[in-house]
Amino acid sequence: VNDSRLQHIHAFDVQGDGSITGGRIICHLKDERPGKPDGMKCDLDGNIYCTGPGGVWILSTNGQHMGTIALGGGRHATNIGWGGGDWKTLFITLYHEIACIRMKIPGVPVPRRI
């Protein structure tokens, strides 16, 4: 769960009965670049993609910052989503445009029915 105001990501443990325990901060996304944590998705390897300062942050499953997809020009990412026939296209919404980038690892598909 990301917190836009405090600029960090919490992880929780989901128990067999569906209850949630063990809340902890796994990553602080504070940075001098513009942007805040907002949209967040995962890939099939469990990596976390979260909009944040400077673009889209890519984090390992334990919250280690592995890199940032830089947007440049002071642009702010607001949300992200996986798409394309192979789920390897990451769509990035910004204030006045939509960008996309091809990734090596497919994203977790959104179920059509819940």
Residue spans of the language-model regions?
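Blade-edge beta-strand/turn elements of extracellular beta-propeller
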Residues: 13-33, 58-72
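A short, acidic, flexible beta-alpha connecting loop/helix-capping segment that sits on the rim
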Residues: 75, 84-86, 93-99, 104-107
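A detector of repeated loop/turn-to-beta-strand junctions in beta-rich toroidal repeat architectures
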Residues: 6-8, 20
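N-terminal first-folded block
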Residues: 1, 12-15, 40
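Short loop/turn segments immediately following beta-strands, especially the blade-tip
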Residues: 12-19, 102-111
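Conserved beta-strand positions in repeat-built beta-propeller and related beta-rich domains
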Residues: 1-5, 47-53, 59, 91-96
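Structural motif
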Residues: 8-11, 59, 98-102
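Beta-rich, blade/repeat-based domains predominating
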Residues: 29-53, 74-88
